[in-house]
């Protein structure tokens, strides 16, 4: 029951509060002129409201510059019970209005110029302009200009400009023209002409601005070289017809984009509305203040509808309040209305309508418009997040493909291999046919896709483009575009920030980075024993120790294992046989077995015991892995001749002083090092700018020649694409080392706001998608290369081994053969000496002993007696020592007869 009771109570209270919300909301209006376009916009906006509550206007026509009259009308409307007031103010009355609004908690919605106030009850419909103005001045790189302003608008914009000028060292001459007469204008512009001041900012309302521009035309200060920035949100509200053919540039801001869907729809409804109330409206160019007025009415309607949905009671009961009471009594419901107004957000005539906690517009967009001799066009837009964003020429520029096609454009470029080169027989051709190269073909493809005629012209100073730090003037191809001497630049022109500020670039047609060029070092010849390189010397030592260790272990296990011993039978006499235990794995046979297994040649003996076979098996496995690994690496080590480079990276350059290094004297590479904040590059820049003699060169060709003649003592820093190209040209003595120091791209450049920018950009993207850009690079870099290797089309070729690669193997073979001959000779001498000594002893024994020896020598070689008396052989069994055949005929003297006795005679 308690829950049901609470539910009904809540519903009842909500119904009571909802019922108390007024169906009619009184709103005030303070206008300077009943016939003004703003007044008509106010009434039209009210007529378009259909949802409750209904807004009932209390409109007063007032002199907005008269503080007394403004106070009287404001208090009069407040006493009549208005919930909010819409109106205008001027510099003389703004402080009074903000003071009353803050004291009485009455919301004042205004399209007048923004003021810097903390009063949250003043809702400012007009966006602030100072940040956008500073962005445009910075965009044009103005360092010295005149600021003409109207003091009636307040000084907030001027103050912001002066503060920024102090930070950026701008030279600003501020001129107040509030009371300037026609003669004053003449003297003003004469004085500016004497000082060569042709860059002017004009900060005035539209009415006064039209008068100033009229004086500019009358005094003929609208010729080529003059540039005016209009600090006004209604560029399209101003009559600029007489500026179209004058040659002067005029830049300004447009708050309302009447080509958008919502503004176009509202303007059509307004045009078709009651002609009796809106006959004085200029439908061709409605003013931006009228659009702000329309949005202001909608802001109030949205706020009161929100309060109604929330069932917030804002009804004014009893006394409506005394405006001049002392002390002032604030209206209790004013806070609720103020919060509701600041929370409104919608898409209106002036774009996104939204307010911050101070009642100022936020998240808005301003369109930047420029007028030159060829018409009006949008050059970009500005918002609080992105600041100024340049845009390609759109429909407002009045430029189209037909205008592009109806003239011959000047394409500036630079002689640089392989981008632009004179043909060998260039004197036999004329015009563009004299040149060949990557950029020559690229320019032809771009012209074919865009559909224009062009003429190639080589830049006179032979430079890419940099700004002089003293005169601030641009040279090279960038200067040609900035000063209107060329229409397009098709060259290896790097896209950089400082260049992008004064010219426009297409999407990159080639990606690259700064690289290091050095003279190619001599290839290192392989050593005599380079066949040992696949394995480290530590591994070879371990293999030797493993070989000896395995041989010793095999010898030991063969001795200890009873299964390694076996019996051999032999005849001792005609009717008697004898058996003996033998073991084939003595120490030398063990070494021989291990060596044969390691060389994968095998041996005529094998282990018989399980322990011996385990030793042999693990040794075979070991040699299998080692030999396989060695063989896998041997080919690479024998066929590759390494070049030992003195440097491998920028870090190596920075930490040494023996090798000098430099860049192009005027170009993006030098600018990169000058602006870099990376420690290594800062160190390199410090060295380069102070090196003696200078390490900078005027052209890339000069840098290449310096590298080749320096004998490895100079490194040249340049774009990787050019480095790769030079590496493919004879005499093939330069090379690129290390990776790229940065990442950037080459782009096709056009003047700021050129009608060619968008078509050229689309053409570059299309050529990239078709693969033509890669095809052109392969053609001019690698297909025409002179060093036999290069791009992706090059095929790997197997290098033939030279004698130096395998000389060590032959040395070992020859050494082994010589060692074998030497060992054989030593064995022969040793054996001969041993037998000679033995025979001398044999000749001295008695005849009976000789006969006995002869008798025993006729027995089989391996007799039991011989085995017991002779030493053990290699395989551990007894052997008899027979006389060599050469010794069997040696004569001996008998003691009894003194006659020589030969063995054959016995």
Curated annotation (Swiss-Prot):
Q: Locate the compositionally biased regions of type Low complexity.
A: 863-872
Report motif location: PDZ-binding.
903-906
The entry's localization annotation reads: Cell membrane; Endoplasmic reticulum membrane; Postsynaptic cell membrane; Postsynaptic density membrane
Q: Lipidation (S-palmitoyl cysteine) at which residues?
A: 603, 829
Quote the catalytic activity from the record: Ca(2+)(in) = Ca(2+)(out); Na(+)(in) = Na(+)(out); Mg(2+)(in) = Mg(2+)(out); Li(+)(in) = Li(+)(out)
Signal peptide start-end = 1-18
Q: Name one Pfam family in it.
A: Lig_chan
Name the predominant localization: membrane
Glycosylation annotated at which residues?
A: 63, 249, 257, 363, 401, 406
Extracellular side, ranges: 19-536, 631-805
Q: Which family does it belong to?
A: Belongs to the glutamate-gated ion channel (TC 1.A.10.1) family. GRIA1 subfamily.
Output this protein's name. Answer: Glutamate receptor 1
According to the entry, what is the taxonomic lineage of the organism? Eukaryota, Metazoa, Chordata, Craniata, Vertebrata
